[in-house]
Structures are given as structure tokens and as C-alpha cells.
From Swiss-Prot:
Keywords on record: ATP-binding, Chaperone, Coiled coil, Cytoplasm, Nucleotide-binding, Proteasome
One Pfam family this sequence matches: AAA
Residue numbers spanned by region Docks into pockets in the proteasome alpha-ring to cause gate opening: 394-396
Organism per entry: Pyrococcus abyssi (strain GE5 / Orsay)
Record-given protein name: Proteasome-activating nucleotidase
Amino acid sequence: MSGDEVQFHENYDDYITYLKRRIRQLELQVRMLEADKERLERELSRLRSEMSRLRQPPAFAGTVIEVLDDDRAIVQNYNGPRFVVRIAPWIERDKLRPGARVALDQRTMAIIELLPSSKDPTVLGFEVIERPNVTYNDIGGLKKQLQELREAIELPLKHPELFEEVGIDPPKGVLLYGPPGCGKTLMAKALAHEVNATFIRVVGSELVRKYIGEGARLVHELFELAKEKAPTIIFIDEIDAIGAKRMDETTGGEREVNRTLMQLLAEMDGFDPRGNVKVIAATNRPDILDPALLRPGRFDRLIEVPLPDFEGRLEILKVHTRRMKLKNVDLRVIAEITEGASGADLKAIATEAGMFAIRERRTYVTQEDFLKAVDKVLGNERKLLQQITSHEIIYG
């Protein structure tokens, strides 16, 4: 074979190799282009669907008044007349009940969609997402009260079969009453931590509204939210803000508070005592509460949370000093000289004792620090009480 022929064959083989490599590259590009084409076709389909949806005419919002047997229902447009309309075949009938919010076709007024229930953002904000970090071990001197609270709230939620076997209904609600700073709110937080339930906390004054009917609507939506999130514990702090005794002569604002109270009474009458919604309320002024609120069937169990006795004060001091470095501190002496102090006072005393130690650049707390803290906390309270009393005597 001549040199020219050898050169020709080498060039031919190289060219064939090049063409094969080029074919593989083109095939890869074709596959990539086909994948891009499929992706763009899906995007085009999505955009066309979105465009079609946006071009649909708006629907009316209405409320179901009554569901009829022949695939029809009576609905009411907001602030408008009532209509007998058809129900679209894709609507789930078991979810279509009186009070449900629905979308109505603009031409035929047929029910075409079920809408979620509307709730005031204030009500949604009442739900506590994270469980409080307070446990039963963080509460001192309230063993009897904690036992009664757990029997009334925790036991029916965890073991409802016990009440069914005995044949009694558990309490619907519990009222905690007593002086300020004695642990009422702390008990509710500890219960919410221990029970695997939704915890809704609301202060009574948050349910008072300016315009007619707003407070009652908030109470209704509060209980609706509790039923949806069941099992649920509703804690109403400072309930005397809406639960005070009703008088014959009232102003416009007081009448609105009375409407809110009546809605609360109606809601508590309306739910099953064996259900998964429990109500706890707290107040410092049980003497001004309306008698209708305290009758059996509403707040069935009244639990007094008094000022702690000597043993209670000692337990509370142990709770608040368990992470403190103490040196030659006799807590029994501190408990003895703090008669009449609340749990909040004792916590303040422990904090002030620590502040006295920090002031002197010490990492431990002594008996002298506690004695100075007792004088500072309880002494200031007594001085303030004397000033208020003398002011009332002088000025009436």
C-alpha cells in the first residue's frame, strides 16, 4: 500500500470518528431541546390555566340558611334577600350545613364552592402556639388547688371514660379567684404545659369593644375556634372585665359589656360538658361577678387561691431559689417573717436578694441579702398602702 493510500485511510478513520462524536453531541442537544420543549409546554399550560382562572367572573359570597332535600339550598347574600339555589354536584354535602359560607355563581346563583369560615384576626391571635414552659413543679404551696384543677380540666380530657363509667358529667368550667400574685395564671400555664391540647389565652378586657355586637361576635368566634382546634383549653384572665354584675341603669358602654357577657353565657350553655373544650377563668374580684356566671352548668368548680401559709411560702421560696447559690441561708426564717406575702412578692424577694449580691460583686447570696430584700419589697408595699389609705381619709 502506497503512502498516499495510508494517509487516505488515516484521514478517513479520523473523519469517521469526528462524525460519530458530532452525532453524539447533536443527539445530546436534541434531548436537551426536547426536555426544554416539554418544560415550556407545561409552563404554557399552567399560564393558560391561570389566565383562564383570572378571566372567570367574580362570585357572590353568601351564607347557607337551610339545606333542602332535592339538591337545593336556601342561601342569603350579605345584607340581601334569600334565594333558593341549586347545589353544584362537586360540593361535599356533609360539609354544607346552615351557617356555612359559600360562593354563588353570578348568573345562576348556584353554590359552586365552599368557603372557609371567617374569623377576626384578633381571635386567631389568642391561640398560643408554643406550650408555656411552666410545670407543676414550678408551683409551690398550691397542692390542693392544683389537684382540684387537674380533676376538673386535665382528667376529662385525658380519661373521659372514667366519667362515663361513674355516670356523671365533668365540670364545664373552673373559676380561680383570690388576691393578686397568688398563682392563678401560673396554674393555668402549668396545666397547658402538661395537657396535650390547644391553649387559648385571652384577657377579659380584650373582649370589650366599642361598637355594638363586636364583643359578642368575638366571644362566638373564640368558641368556634376552640371547637375547631379541640381538644382546647380556653383561659379567660381578669374575667371581671366582662362578667361584672348587671345593673338596671347602664350607659352605652356598659350595655355592650352586658351583651358580651350574655354571649359568653350562651356559649357556655351550648357546648357538651363531655366534649373537648374546657374553660378556665381567673379574677381578683369574685364579689362583683354576675351570679348567672357562677351557677352550676357554667363555672361548676370555684377554686380559691389564697395567700400562702408558712409551709406554702417555704415551698415557693425553695422553687425560686433552687438555681441560686445560697450561703448560710435559712429559708424557714425568711418564710416566717414574710407573713401576708404573695407568691409574686416572694419571687421579687428572691430576685432582689440576688441583686444585692451582684451589687457587692458576689456569686452567692447570704441571709443578710434576703433580709434586706424582704425589707425593700414588703416595706415599699406597706408604705404605698399607708399612703393610699391616708389619701382616702383626707380626700374621701
